[in-house]
């Protein structure tokens, strides 16, 4: 499996790229453990393209599944978040890779077979925004807040295939989950120091 690169290296870069595809990512109102992925404009009760499950227990902490994610045959990929390490273990369609996470910046980077190293970079002003950059610093995708409560919007800014979308979804939500875990751990340490 390789990434779709046909138009990736075309000339005509823009300082303000427009989305090639936009996805609405919202918590499922009837299931607090699921996050649903739809193309932007679809109602929350329509069948999702993907569902994301985030768990603090178990072997896989972030799981991306096709549709509602009814069984193991629907699983696209999963991420195992570290307890005492900076390496997030990703598996997508059976292919393992490691994503390196920086607690100082909240950024993470991971290798891809055909695009080199990609990096999720948190906005320095808001942890609600993050950009996916390639090695040259070109923005490939971005995640930002949507209009509805709890909604995130994923904009993919380059021509892509389904595999690239799945890599983006898994790596983005693994990074978000690890940032949340690191923030909670920092809060506990500060609380322990102040309480002592």
Where are these regions (language model features)?
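Low-complexity or membrane-interfacial segments used for flexible interactions
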Residues: 1-44, 48-49, 107, 114-196
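Acidic, polar low-complexity intrinsically disordered regions
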Residues: 33-127
């Amino acid at each position: 499996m390789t990434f779709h690169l046909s138009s990736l290296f075309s000339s005509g870069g823009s300082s303000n790229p427009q989305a090639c595809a936009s996805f609405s990512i919202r918590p499922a109102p009837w299931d607090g453990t699921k996050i649903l992925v739809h193309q932007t404009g679809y109602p929350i009760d329509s069948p999702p393209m993907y569902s994301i499950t985030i768990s603090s227990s178990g072997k896989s902490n972030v799981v991306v599944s096709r549709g509602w994610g009814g069984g193991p045959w629907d699983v696209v990929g999963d991420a195992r978040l570290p307890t005492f390490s900076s390496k997030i273990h990703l598996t997508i369609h059976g292919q393992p890779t490691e994503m390196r996470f920086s607690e100082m910046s909240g950024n993470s980077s991971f290798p891809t077979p055909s695009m080199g190293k990609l990096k999720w970079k948190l906005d320095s002003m808001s942890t609600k925004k993050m950009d996916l950059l390639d090695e040259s610093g070109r923005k490939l995708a971005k995640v930002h807040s949507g209009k509805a409560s709890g909604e995130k919007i994923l904009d993919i800014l380059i021509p892509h295939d389904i595999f690239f979308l799945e890599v983006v979804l898994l790596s983005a939500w693994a990074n978000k989950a690890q940032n949340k875990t690191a923030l909670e751990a920092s809060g506990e340490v500060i609380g322990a120091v102040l309480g002592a």
